[in-house]
Amino acid sequence: MSDSGHSQPNVFIPGRNRRRRWMDQGPAGNLNLSEPGREKDSVLRDRDQERWEGNDEGCGYTIQKTPIILAKPASDRAKAATPAAPAPIEKPIVLMKAREEGKPTAPAEGAAVPPAAAVAKVEKEGQRPTQPVYQIQNRGMGAAASAGGSVDPVVGQAKLLPPQKMKHSIKLVDEYMNWCDSAIEFLLDQTDVLVVGVLGLQGTGKSTLMSLLSANSPDDDQRSYVFRMQSQEVRERAGNQTSGIDFFISQERIIFLDTQPILSPAILDHLINNDRKLPPEYNLPHTYVEMQSLQIAAFLFTVCHVVIVVQDWFTDFNLYRFLQTAEMLKPSTPSPSHESSGSSGSDEGIEYYPHIVFVQNKSKREDFCPRTLKQMHTVMDKLMLHSHLRYKGTLSMLDCNIFPGLPYDFVESEVNLFLIPTMESDADETISRAGTSGIPLFSLLPAYKGHPSFHSLVSRLRSQIMSMSRPQLSHTILTEKNWFHYAARIWDGVKKSSALSEYSRLLG
C-alpha cells in the first residue's frame, strides 16, 4: 500500500512473497509435529529469515531495470578489426655459412627468426642449396627474380659451380690472323689474373715449356700436353706446329698464350710453295712473315704481364733487334675515359711495359758454370740497355739456391735469365750412369750433371713466374672477361696500326 492507500501493481517484493509462501503452506494440522520434522522446518524458517533480512538491509524494495548494453561505434569497430601495420624493420646483415648436408642448422642467439611465410616458401621450393640464394642473385639473377619469377635453386647452384676445367688449348688467333671468341666461355668476372705469353724462334721448345708451366708434368705423356708439341713428322720436314696464338687458362687463373714462331722459315716456305694470296698491303712474302711476327710481339707486349723469350743457344742478335723493333711499334696504352681524364692529368704519360724473362732452353753443363753465367748476364744487359721492357730485377737464379756458395751480388747487373737443361727420360739417366762396360757403376747414386734436375728447375721457374707482380694493363682494373675484350680491341688496333703499315712500306 502507498501513502495514499492505493496499491501499486508493478512493485515486486520477493522477500515478502517468499515469507508468505512458507507461512501459508497449510493448516497446522497437516504439519508433522515429530522432532525431525520440527527441526527441518526450523532450519528452513531460519534460512529464509536470513534471506529476508538481507534484502531488507540492502535497499528495501528492489525494482527490476532494463539492462543497458554498451557498444562501440561502427568506425571504431572497423579500426579495431584491422590490425595496425608494423613499422618497417631494417633487414639485418647475416653472415651465413654453408651447412653440411643432412645436418640441421640451429639459429644463433640474437639472430632474426624468419617469418612463417618465408619458411613455407623454402619448404615448397625443395631442398635449400648449400649457398645462400642472395649470393646467386648478386651474380646477375636479381633482374630475373625482380621481374616476377623466383630464383630456381638448381640454376643458382649451377651458377656457383667452379669454372669448367680446360683440357687442351684453343685458338685465340687463327692461322689467318683472325680473332676467335671461343675463349670467353672459360673466363670469369674476377680481377686476380696473370697473363703469360711466349715468343721464340722455330723449334726452341715454346709449346713444351708452356705446357710444363701451365698444367703438365715432365712425367706426363707428351701427347697429352695442353699445347701440342712438334710431332716426329713435323720435325723431319722442318715445319712448325703452332699457328696463330693458342689460349689456355689454368686452375690458378693464369692465362697462357702460345704463339707461332717468329721469323719462321717454315711459314715463309708455306707461303711461297702454296701460292697463298698475300694481303694487298704486302708485296713480298718475307715482308708479310716479318710483319706477322711483329704484330704478335706488339700484341703480347700490350696484353701480357710476363713475356717469355725462349732461345736454345746463346745468342742470336737478330732476336734482340726484333724485340726492340716490336717495342717501338707497340701500341700505346689506351687513355682513360673522358670522365676521369681531367682529374688524372699526371698519368697521361705513363706507358705500360711487361716483364721479359729470357729462358735458355736445352742448356749444356758448361752453361751452368758461374763464370759463363756472369758473362751471359753482362752481354744481355748491354744488348737491352736502352729498352723500356722490364728485363731485370724480377727473376733470379741465385735466389733459387741453384748455385750454392755464390753470393747474391756475384752478378752486378742480373738479367731475368733462367737456364733449363735438355729434358731427359729415365732411360737416358740410366745410360749416363753406366760406365764403359755398360753396367751402372753407382746405381744408387744419381749421375753427375753439373746442374739440378730438369724437374727441379722447371718447378722453380714456374714458382718465380707465378709470384711476379701483376701491374695494371690499362688505366682501369680488368677482370678476366674485360681482359678478353681489351685484348680483342688491341689486336684489331695492331692490325690497323699506321706505324706498322709505315714500317712495312720501309721494308719494301
Swiss-Prot record:
The keyword Cytoplasm does not apply. Residues 1-10 have a biased composition (Polar residues). It comes from the Eukaryota. Keywords: Nonsense-mediated mRNA decay. GO terms for biological process: nuclear-transcribed mRNA catabolic process, nonsense-mediated decay. Residues 1-59 are annotated as: Disordered. Gene3D superfamilies: P-loop containing nucleotide triphosphate hydrolases. Residues 36-54 have a biased composition (Basic and acidic residues). The keyword Repressor does not apply. Component of the SMG1C complex composed of smg1, smg8 and smg9. Belongs to the SMG9 family. Involved in nonsense-mediated decay (NMD) of mRNAs containing premature stop codons. Is recruited by release factors to stalled ribosomes together with smg1 and smg8 (forming the SMG1C protein kinase complex) and, in the SMG1C complex, is required for the efficient association between smg1 and smg8. This is Nonsense-mediated mRNA decay factor SMG9. It comes from Xenopus laevis (African clawed frog). The lineage of its organism: Eukaryota, Metazoa, Chordata, Craniata, Vertebrata.
